[in-house]
A protein has these predicted regions:
Chain A
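Short, non-helical or kinked segments that cap or interrupt transmembrane helices
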Residues: 29-51, 91-104, 180, 224-239, ...
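Membrane-interfacial amphipathic/re-entrant helices at transmembrane-helix boundaries
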Residues: 1-25, 37, 51, 60-71
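Transmembrane alpha-helical segments in multi-pass inner-membrane proteins
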Residues: 223-292
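Alpha-helical transmembrane segments within multi-pass membrane transporters and channels
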Residues: 64-109, 265
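Helix-loop-helix "hairpin" substructures at the membrane interface of multi-pass membrane proteins
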Residues: 149-228, 251-252, 256
Length: 321, 348
């Protein structure tokens, strides 16, 4: 493979790997900007991946080619409902949000596997017939060099993911809802004094994060694996969490970080087949641990503590100072 | 009701609620919860073999629970027990296989090596937290994945490309013919005594030494501890290191007792994450950890009997465990409920 051919392979694959991370990480941005730590992203993603596959298998005869897209909506819905548990615990019951998130993670994988065994009588589902299709974007695909890199056989979901980042940026920074969201996350008491319902905003934010993580999981299962088993998501949710932090709790930052993590994952799986000498010489394990090590380094080096929303992780108790 | 009683009631109510919701889930999924829980019970206490295996399962749970609880006492949340356990497991198996020494030296050295490996994995988030204020939760999660991939790569390296390490030497093994015969040839091993000894160590450390006092003080209030002249940074690092050492020993239980080797792991063992549940349920006290580990270890092992005896997927137990954590975490609402109940009684 020439260097250009390598790029033609790596860049689309990186974007494909990044799409689920972008959705989930931006979900995390919503939740944490409102002051609710959401470690449960992994569990929510698992839920989404599971629902996406099961819905796809069940309704493929009804919806035909549209099945994967409608599966995304189903996954969004179920994961959003599931995330209400986290909202209730961390907003109304004043639970430790990290612990509640851990419970969500355990519960997500347990419910999904329990249901899979109940429905299929084995540890993983069947393979879906209709995966999310790859499309060529007209006109743009004919641009020399850039065309095959970015616009040939891309997943529609990747385009959606990148668009979502900008929509999320607009919502968080340019709308009244976004302003309220951020104020609740920075100083809930001040927001409360101004007549904003802290718990309403936090509930909304957590449910949005659940829905987006659900879509993220369903994208992953419907593009990468094609079935659902115990190892389908395996840490993607935590990687999204890392992308959110790496991106400084900002949608565009999260987008960049997710793209980078997608690139690192692509290198990890394809390093051995890339015919470039110095990449071949590096053992695959270094690529595997790269996203995690980078996150640690980023936290230690580039990102100060000040970037996290100030009230992140603290339940708001009315009347207390 | 006194505070003490409430503190005891919250976990008990959580367990009951968890089991109750689990029963409802079974009912709605078309399974019989009664036969399910009977199968679970028999899976735990059915015969002496089951009891032996259950106790075997409890040993790493005690150590994982101690690891989480110890860090909690200094105000730190160590989600990295899973990773520390894995490096401990690998180190134990490696040291156990690579050297030929008399047992009286070999076994302690192997256990020590596992503890050190876990401690090293805990040292990184400890240092980052103490010096740069990086949140330990994120770092430990990341360290888990680093551990998973590094250990898998190391297994491949030391075994010459295979997926499994060599068996450990008998001189490093925790296996016990006596315990095994006692329990109808189960894999019960001496690890349970190591675990119980560590419970005593944690209690002694926290309650009877100056170091323990400082660790707890830092957990209560960092600023006050600083003002009182304690070295907060040193205590944070020390807490993570000791926590990691417990986790490393939990890995040694698997390596030296249960399996005698290590295969490449497709995912996490889950023991480290369940350790969070153990610690929470045990209110982060050494004795409470024994209680929590016994409950969750039994549930986890007993669940294996459910698919055969009652035709119910064993994941139902994971659902119950997750629900218990959820309810314990939401203890505030249980407390409120208990208070209301109390007031009504007083009014009458």
């Amino acid at each position: 493979m020439s260097f250009l051919e390598v790029l033609y392979f790596i860049i689309p694959t990186s974007i494909a790997y990044a799409a689920p991370l972008i959705f989930t990480a931006i979900g995390g941005v919503f939740s944490e900007r409102s002051g609710v730590v959401n470690i449960g992203l992994e569990g929510l993603m698992v839920m989404g991946a599971f629902v996406g596959i099961v819905f796809n298998l069940a309704f493929v005869d009804v919806f035909g080619g549209w099945t994967p897209w409608i599966s995304l909506l189903a996954a969004m819905l179920v994961a959003a409902i599931f995330s209400i548990m986290h909202a209730v615990a961390s907003v109304s019951f004043r639970a430790d949000q990290v612990v509640s998130g851990v419970a969500i993670n355990m519960l997500g994988i347990a419910i999904a596997l329990f249901s899979v065994k109940m429905m299929f009588g084995k540890g993983q589902t069947d393979f879906i017939q209709e995966k999310i299709p790859r499309v060529n974007i007209p006109i743009l695909q004919d641009i020399p060099v850039l065309g095959p890199m970015f616009f040939k056989s891309v997943y529609g979901t990747s385009v959606l993911a990148i668009a979502l980042a900008f929509v999320a940026w607009f919502v968080i920074y340019k709308t009244p809802f976004g302003l309220r969201l951020r104020s609740v996350g920075e100083h809930p008491m001040a927001a409360d004094t101004m007549g904003i319902s802290v718990s309403k905003i936090r509930y909304t934010a957590v449910i949005i994060s659940g829905g987006l993580a659900g879509i993220g999981g369903a994208i992953y299962s419907q593009t990468m694996t094609g079935d659902f088993g115990h190892a389908t998501i395996n840490g993607q949710g935590f990687m999204a969490l890392a992308a959110m932090i790496f991106g400084k709790w900002h949608p565009i930052g999260a987008l960049g970080a997710a793209l980078f993590f997608g690139f690192a994952q692509t290198l990890a799986i394809s390093a051995s087949s890339i015919d470039i000498d110095f990449i071949q010489k590096i053992p695959a394990v270094y690529f595997h641990i790269l996203p995690y090590v980078l996150t640690i380094l980023a936290l230690a080096g580039f990102i100060g503590k000040a970037n996290a929303p100030k009230a992140n992780g603290e339940p708001y108790i009315k009347g207390s100072r | 009701m006194s505070n003490r009683v409430v503190n005891l009631l919250v976990p008990i109510i959580s367990i009951i609620l968890g089991l109750l919701v689990g029963a409802i889930v079974m009912l709605f999924s078309g399974y019989d919860p009664v036969s399910g829980y009977i199968a679970l019970w028999n899976g735990i206490f059915g015969d002496s073999y089951a009891i032996g295996e259950t106790i075997r399962q409890i040993s790493p749970y005690i150590l994982a629970g101690l690891a989480v609880a110890f860090a909690f006492r200094s105000g730190l949340f160590n989600i990295g027990v899973e990773g520390q356990l894995m490096v401990g497991w690998f180190t134990a198996v490696y040291v156990g296989a690579a050297f030929e020494l008399p047992m009286i030296i070999h076994l302690p050295i192997t256990l020590l090596a596992a503890a050190l490996a876990g401690a090293l994995w805990g040292l990184v988030p400890g240092i980052l937290k103490a010096t740069l204020k990086v949140h330990e939760v994120i770092v430990t999660i990341m360290m888990n994945y680093v551990a998973l991939h590094v250990v898998n790569a190391l297994i491949k390296t030391v075994s010459g490309g295979s997926y499994k390490t060599d068996k450990i030497q008998p001189t490093a093994s925790l296996r016990s013919d006596f315990l095994s015969n006692l329990t109808d040839y189960s894999t019960l091993h001496y690890g349970i005594f190591v675990a119980l000894a560590m419970v005593a160590v944690m209690w002694f450390l926290l309650e009877k030494t100056k170091t323990g006092f400082e660790l707890k003080a830092v957990g209560f209030n960092e600023n006050a501890s600083q003002y009182a002249g304690m070295n907060v940074k040193k205590n944070i690092i020390l807490s993570m290191v000791i926590s990691g050492a417990f986790a490393g020993l939990a890995g040694a239980m698997e390596g030296l007792g249960t399996f005698g080797s290590m295969t490449t792991q497709g995912g996490f063992t889950g023991i480290g994450f369940d350790g969070i549940a153990v610690a929470l349920l045990g209110a982060n006290t050494p004795l409470g950890v024994i209680f929590g580990a016994s409950l969750f270890g039994s549930l986890k092992y007993g669940a294996n009997n459910m698919p055969n005896a009652a035709n119910i997927p064993l994941e139902i137990v994971s659902i119950v465990v997750a629900l218990i954590i959820f309810f314990v975490a939401s203890g505030y609402i249980i407390r409120v409920g208990l208070q209301r109940l109390n007031k009504k009684k007083e009014a009458k």
